A protein has these predicted regions:
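Bacterial extracytoplasmic/cell-wall-associated proteins, especially those involved in peptidoglycan
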Residues: 30-172
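Short, Lys/Arg-rich N-terminal segment immediately upstream of the first membrane anchor
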Residues: 1-9
Length: 172
């Protein structure tokens, strides 16, 4: 009879989890929010990073909401027309990003943009993949802006509140 150590079982479980994620992410694209075209890995990664860094402490519905806002911006003529450009939109001076002058604060806060919590990161990848490959109802009501409920940005005074989800307030 074989005996497996707890460490060996844990490593095997992590390997299987990575493998399943890889299979899931590489599945054929289905019609959905991605306008029925294949989604590139960069778009998936950019959307997942935005979900991870903007909403990793939220319930799953709040994480989906952040992803939906990102996609709503891609569809809006006032924003760039691809996911990565929306996520990394920032003010630059001499080709350098100005700290705290970007659309999503995690990108220009001076901290690492590498996800540390792998379990939460894989959850963000799955949410991003679902949003890009399936028709997910936009329960944010078309929101293009949001902020955490513990701050009141200047821009929010001129926006109409559409919905509150978790720790975020969403605007048109």
């Amino acid at each position: 009879m074989f005996k497996f150590s707890e460490e060996g079982i844990a490593k095997f479980t992590i390997f299987c989890f990575f493998y399943l994620i890889l299979i899931f992410v590489s599945m054929a694209t289905l019609p959905g929010n991605a306008d029925s075209h294949e989604v590139d890995k960069d778009s998936l990664n950019c959307l997942a990073k935005n979900i991870y860094f903007e909403a990793r402490g939220e319930e799953i519905i709040g994480q989906y909401a952040i992803g939906l806002v990102t996609l709503n911006r891609v569809k809006d003529k006032d924003f760039p027309n691809n996911i990565c450009d929306v996520v990394y939109q920032a003010i630059k001076i001499n080709n350098k990003i100005v700290k705290y002058k970007c659309q999503f604060s995690w990108y220009c806060d001076g901290k690492s943009d590498t996800p540390k919590d792998l379990q939460t990161w894989y959850k963000a990848i799955n949410i991003a993949d679902t949003l890009l490959h399936f028709n997910v109802e936009d329960f944010t009501r078309g929101s293009r802006f949001y902020h955490a409920d513990y701050v009141v940005p200047k821009w929010s005074k001129n926006k109409k509140v559409l919905i509150r989800i978790g720790k975020h307030i969403f605007y048109e």
